[in-house]
């Protein structure tokens, strides 16, 4: 009789220990552990962290205010193209600048590679890029670092409640074409559709460098879109899809059924996880000129780097100031082979 009692107690203790361990896996939430959501393919890792529009929104500064551009004594036109992640900010700043100065600005996307090539060839006055010029084997341009952009993976709304977090290894497997159905990593039985960007994209370059570990994307079922907005729309309309966008496209969308942001290794695309070094999918935004900036482009860049813009339009469009990001984090995303940038920040 005593032997049976001891056996029952032993089984009960083991069951309790197992339950506690299972609870620990499920409760490994955002930012609570460097191992949160990693390892294994069970469904618990897919819900170990939840990124929302609210918790990836930059709430600093005065985003409700619109700056006024002082007269800079310049005229004529300003041309820029390149990064579709940086375009919304430069476009918004240029609109205010044009109103105060009578200039005419044309701010287009096309990808960071195009921006660097076009400014180098003299096709535009400003080349917008998420990457350093050396990443595209270009040299001799003058860098102006104007903001920090956070990127996030997003999934179609139909799987948003079941896929909220992916480990780096799971992401690598998806983008290598090894995972083609969400059920392979504990998700729903639904085909994975990868919505990506062309090779000249700075967002893609950032993703490959800081998430895939410098590996190229070779997914199976793929849709390629030319700009960030097109990626956002494609993920919105394609069941089972996943893609990457700058967080401003997520926080500025109020449409029902919009793609949902997800965590990486239990961390989300916000300043806290960027500053801790745990979230690496972000980059410094560059506005390149051919030689030191002059004339109207210089005046526009000075306005962009002014506190009037940095404290209003940056947070409104969900960018971060460089000074709000820890120096250790900035250094981890700085190219040692590129020259120091030209700066128009106050006190510089």
Model-derived features: positions:
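Bacterial N-terminal signal peptides that target proteins for export
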Residues: 3-17
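Exported/periplasmic ABC-transporter solute-binding proteins
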Residues: 31-120, 124-125, 129-348
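C-terminal motif of bacterial Sec signal peptides marking the signal peptidase cleavage site
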Residues: 24-29
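N-terminal targeting signals for export/organelle localization
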Residues: 2-3, 38
């Amino acid at each position: 009789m005593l032997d049976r009692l001891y056996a029952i107690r032993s089984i009960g203790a083991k069951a309790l220990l197992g339950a506690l361990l299972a609870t620990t896996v499920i409760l490994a939430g955002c930012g609570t552990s460097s191992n949160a959501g990693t390892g294994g393919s069970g469904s618990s890792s897919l819900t170990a962290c939840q990124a929302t529009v609210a918790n990836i929104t930059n709430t600093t500064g005065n985003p409700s205010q619109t700056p006024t551009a002082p007269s800079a004594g310049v005229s004529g036109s300003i041309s820029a193209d390149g990064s579709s992640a940086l375009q919304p900010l430069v476009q918004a700043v240029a609109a205010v600048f044009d109103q105060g100065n009578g200039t005419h600005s044309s701010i287009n996307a096309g990808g960071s590679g195009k921006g660097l090539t076009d400014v180098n060839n003299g096709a535009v006055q400003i080349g917008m890029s998420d990457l350093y010029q050396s990443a595209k084997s270009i040299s001799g341009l003058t860098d102006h670092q104007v903001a920090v952009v956070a990127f996030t993976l997003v999934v179609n709304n139909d799987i948003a409640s079941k896929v909220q977090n992916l480990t780096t290894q799971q992401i690598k497997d998806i983008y290598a074409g090894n995972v083609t159905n969400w059920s392979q990593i504990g998700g729903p039985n639904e085909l994975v559709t990868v919505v990506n960007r062309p090779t000249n994209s700075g967002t893609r370059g950032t993703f490959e460098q800081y998430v895939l570990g410098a590996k190229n994307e070779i997914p199976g079922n793929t849709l390629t879109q030319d700009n960030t907005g097109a990626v956002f729309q494609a993920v919105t309309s394609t069941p089972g899809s996943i893609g990457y966008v700058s967080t401003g496209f997520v926080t500025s969308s109020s449409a029902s059924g919009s793609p949902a942001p997800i965590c990486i290794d239990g961390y989300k695309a916000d300043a806290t996880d960027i500053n801790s070094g745990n979230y690496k999918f972000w980059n410094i935004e560059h506005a390149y000129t051919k030689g030191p900036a002059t004339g109207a482009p210089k005046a526009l860049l000075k306005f962009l780097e002014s506190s009037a813009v940095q404290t209003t339009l940056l947070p409104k469009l969900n960018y971060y100031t460089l000074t709000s990001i820890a120096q250790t984090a900035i250094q981890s995303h700085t190219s040692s082979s590129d020259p120091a940038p030209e700066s128009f920040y106050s006190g510089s």
